[in-house]
């Protein structure tokens, strides 16, 4: 065993201060003296390869690894797949209970064992042993319908696999679902999966291209957190639709520029949203003011987010909102207290309009990689008194154009307590100039502190 591995499983100390003083060298292995059940509990936190290493510590440790109800293996730790398969077979036969089944397999497996048969057999055996957590990464392997019916399963994580057609889905205990680059049988199969998880609380979906689902319906009465990601592959179809109906949802993350439509039915409990989408306005596609169905979809999307308290928006999303705002007024966000936004080009023009919709905004974070060189845009827009704003953090290089934004915030925020400027290396060289200009800017708030980092 390597030194680091031994340090994790063995702790020694002197029997007593007297023996230490006498230099007797007598030591006690305190971990080995623990009850076997407690040792097994400790070993549950280690990968299986490290658990097996403990068998060389002493006679007592020789077979303890066999009673650890957790399998966590990576095929890279085996010279060939046949050896991996043989080990898993022995492990599953010797354990009546398996709490967690975690397996990482590459796509270049050598051996005579049939992969599909192995995946079916091992998952079936884990289910029979009342498994609570399944975590499988196995490019291209087919996961058979047994996975859809497991009363004990609490969390399910599948990566790069293909799900077969379900006849029936019943996952009454499943609370966490993570699907990463998974291919579904069809849309109806995905709908069945969602409807068969009555207590699901967290769902993360990282979509692959051509996953056989055009309209993705995430409908759940129990869901608290939903994270949605998509690939930027050119093979992605351009008519993808996401329908979200989750009245208990509190946290939402959307990140995929190529999904054309997001339809929000009910997000009445939403607290936090992180939005990085542009409704497929990319690869040459532009916002069309005359496309009334698209405008209605965007309007309903923004209204669906209107109860949120904390929101982060990417530059591409702000671009769409800016184009939309020139056609229709933005909805109100009466609960929004924290707003973080990344923007570029001239899209900071939207800020005064957006501020009008946020009557209770208290904290604002602004990030940008690019600003227009001209001192324009915001000064010509209608002035909006930021009556609730207390904290502002600006994270980008400062120049004359960006100082106009700082001026706008200082002059229109009557209860602002702190404005923090986080400068990059180039801006720090001009810090004296920046500080002199800051001093000359009138402040609407008499108690505002300006901090330059």
From Swiss-Prot:
Family annotation (SUPFAM superfamilies): F-box domain, RNI-like
InterPro entries: F-box-like_dom_sf (IPR036047), F-box_AtFBL13-like (IPR053781), F-box_dom (IPR001810), FBD (IPR006566), FBL13/AtMIF1-like (IPR050232), LRR_dom_sf (IPR032675), LRR_FXL15/At3g58940/PEG3-like (IPR055411)
Chain positions covered by the region annotation Disordered: 1-28
Keywords recorded for this protein, A-Z: Leucine-rich repeat, Repeat
Residue ranges, compositional bias (Polar residues): 14-23
Domain F-box positions: 28-81
Origin: domain of life: Eukaryota
LRR repeat ranges, renumbered to this chain: 155-179, 210-235, 246-269, 305-329, 358-381
Domain named FBD: residues: 373-423
Pfam families per the UniProt record, alphabetical: F-box (PF00646), FBD (PF08387), LRR_At5g56370 (PF24758)
Annotated PANTHER family: F-BOX/RNI SUPERFAMILY PROTEIN-RELATED, FBD DOMAIN-CONTAINING PROTEIN
Protein name per the record: Putative F-box/FBD/LRR-repeat protein At1g66290
Organism: Arabidopsis thaliana (Mouse-ear cress)
Source lineage: Eukaryota, Viridiplantae, Streptophyta, Embryophyta, Tracheophyta
